Amino acid sequence: MNCSAFSFWFVCKIIFFFLSFNIQISIANPQENFLKCFSEYIPNNPANPKFIYTQHDQLYMSVLNSTIQNLRFTSDTTPKPLVIVTPSNVSHIQASILCSKKVGLQIRTRSGGHDAEGLSYISQVPFAIVDLRNMHTVKVDIHSQTAWVEAGATLGEVYYWINEMNENFSFPGGYCPTVGVGGHFSGGGYGALMRNYGLAADNIIDAHLVNVDGKVLDRKSMGEDLFWAIRGGGGENFGIIAAWKIKLVVVPSKATIFSVKKNMEIHGLVKLFNKWQNIAYKYDKDLMLTTHFRTRNITDNHGKNKTTVHGYFSSIFLGGVDSLVDLMNKSFPELGIKKTDCKELSWIDTTIFYSGVVNYNTANFKKEILLDRSAGKKTAFSIKLDYVKKLIPETAMVKILEKLYEEEVGVGMYVLYPYGGIMDEISESAIPFPHRAGIMYELWYTATWEKQEDNEKHINWVRSVYNFTTPYVSQNPRLAYLNYRDLDLGKTNPESPNNYTQARIWGEKYFGKNFNRLVKVKTKADPNNFFRNEQSIPPLPPHHH
């Protein structure tokens, strides 16, 4: 080998060594590289509040756990993010996306932390969390009957600020005030006004989305296909939602509620249930009559602890007490509703009554409770949901209720919400959420518990109920709801860029015939599948474009 050839070979080897070393450093230190990249977009200013946390920060675990609503996912073995970004403006979101792409981190976007499977803050591969807690402004314009809501706001904040501006307006979102609007709206979002006004997603008229290239898009610039997709198809599949523009709805100055408990043997509860399932979805849209069954631990006459099951029937009626009592006595006399069972409340007070975070009868509360993001007790839980299209036979419902007595239940509950009303009139393709005409009610099964070591036992109990009810619920496919995400339906490999065949199995359960349109939108908006998780919408493989 001559000298010049040797020199060239030596130089090439040195270059290759340094390139390899740099690549190894890049792979070994994605956290440091993310911080370096972020500082290039957003120069560090010590005067600004801290909004980036790494595993070396004292507040890291506090920030991470603060909005994890399901205590199943707070164990030491739960995968943790390398970085948590808590943006205070859109530029922080843009930098988070661009830097995550650059250093090879996946992104999980968290609004309120209620994801049933924890996918808004858990990944099996290296990841960063974009936690939107600091972006929670609600700007209400009563003149146009609209509001811009940042995606980190909670439902409680939305209801509170609308009510502050005008108590005759509200928004048709869910019951739980600590749920974040980022996920709730983008998955559909049902609640007390569903039979009047449809879902939360049916009442969204604009949005700000930060896409895979870090660009901020509104409805006009994103186009109608992408705007359609983020309202019920899961916004996290297409980018990060920064804000929603919502259409306010009119509510009466007073509404009437009742919530009655029925403590009787199972056959008596089933008789009431059967009457409920025959009529609840047929009522005028001004009445939402729900029911739920739950376990209670009581002490019998001999001082022994035992489990019993109580039934509860609860209403929200957009009218007066006399009208509601008259309606119930004519249509559902078995329930025995009396005037003394009812309360006439302002709309905001009905929201608080059904919020689950206060005891309305004993608490000295104000509507400011809706602003408390930590209201309510956190537990570990598991949940599955079904849609019912035909009456469940009484004999079957007896056996379903009997499962609440099984030892593995923890605190078990079945909750049933009637559909019908305007839900029957909205096309199943209006937004990606397809569960409209033909759905009588939704039925969900849940167990809650305290100890981490009991996780598997109680999760398996919920699975056993779900398996038992198979013949009595929707079929071919068995329908599901994105906001009650269920990884038992199937999951894709988040490291794999193309998972269409796998994803179709669960995608058609969530979205029905809308799944293929979502895939086409994804293929155009995020062809390399940067925004992905175990149940994300996949793009089509390149040869299928």
From Swiss-Prot:
Tissue expression notes: Expressed in young leaves.
State the Gene Ontology BP annotations: cannabinoid biosynthetic process; terpenoid biosynthetic process
Lineage top rank: taxon: Eukaryota
- UniProt binding sites for cannabigerolate: 292, 417, 442
Give the FAD-binding PCMH-type domain ranges. Answer: 77-251
EC number(s) of the enzyme? 1.21.99.-
Keywords, comma-separated and alphabetical = Disulfide bond, FAD, Flavoprotein, Glycoprotein, Oxidoreductase, Signal
Q: What is the cofactor note?
A: Binds 1 FAD per subunit in a bicovalent manner.
UniProt signal peptide: 1-28
Q: How does it assemble?
A: Monomer. May form homodimer.
> Hey, which pathway is this one from?
Secondary metabolite biosynthesis; terpenoid biosynthesis
Q: Which residues form the active site?
A: 484 (proton acceptor)
Reactions accelerated catalytically: cannabigerolate + A = cannabichromenate + AH2; cannabinerolate + A = cannabichromenate + AH2
Record: glycosylation sites: 65, 89, 168, 297, 305, 329, 467, 499
Q: How is it modified after translation?
A: The FAD cofactor is bound via a bicovalent 6-S-cysteinyl, 8alpha-N1-histidyl FAD linkage.
Organism equals Cannabis sativa
Q: What does the UniProt record note about how this protein's activity is regulated?
A: Inhibited by hydrogen peroxide H(2)O(2) and FMN. Completely repressed activity by Hg(2+).
Q: Which cofactor does it need?
A: FAD
Q: What is this protein called?
A: Cannabichromenic acid synthase
